[in-house]
Structure formats: structure tokens, C-alpha cells
């Protein structure tokens, strides 16, 4: 019997970090669909095009903070303005290579952001994300 893992969207301007995240997610959650975006605006467009989420009940967004054009907090601001119907199909986990405490404090102010993790992603972080994504 296989576990039905959620889908993932990885948003990171680093192609290498996107690749690493995809590999870790794919090996940890073998039947999960993983989409990567190096531009946060493109990821937001994808969410808007989906309207009611993916075919699965939940999509987990792994969101980098420091990106050009639209950073993680800009993305979160735009996401917070979406309809509740759209937002209900997603949970956001931010990732960063920064040790800036103000990022953690700021992330806590967004209802859609569940937690802020330090890079790099690991299998244990992905499993923790999955376990906490289905609880409020």
C-alpha cells in the first residue's frame, strides 16, 4: 500500500537549490508531484491558474525568502490576498540560508506560513513538514 503524499511547489531562485529540493522530496515521497519555479511570480500565476489547488487535497509550498523581483515575503503578501477557497489548498513553509532573526519574526506574522526552516532541506525536514501540514 502506497502513501498518498501531497503535491509540492518549490520556489527558489537558485536552480541548484530547486534541484536538491526536488530530489529530496522525490526520494522521500515517491508518488508526490513536485513543481519548481525560480521566479515567485510564476509560482503565484500557477496557483491562480489552478484555482482550487491540485488534484490532491493539499499542496505544500517550499518558499525561499531571498529572491530577486518577488521575494518570499512579497509572495506571501500576494498569497494572503487570494480567496480562502484557493488558500485552503496550500500550506507554505519558508526556507532560508540566512540566520537573520527578523526573518523568523516576520514569517510568524503570516497566517499562511507554517514555519521557517534553514537550508538545506533534508529528508527529516520534509517528513516533519508532511506531518505538520495536516494539522492546524
Where are these regions (language model features)?
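C-terminal output helix
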Residues: 120-130
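Conserved acidic segment of CheY-like receiver
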Residues: 6-16, 21-25
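Two-component signal transduction core modules
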Residues: 61, 115-116
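Receiver (REC) domain active-site loop signature in two-component systems and cognate sites
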Residues: 67
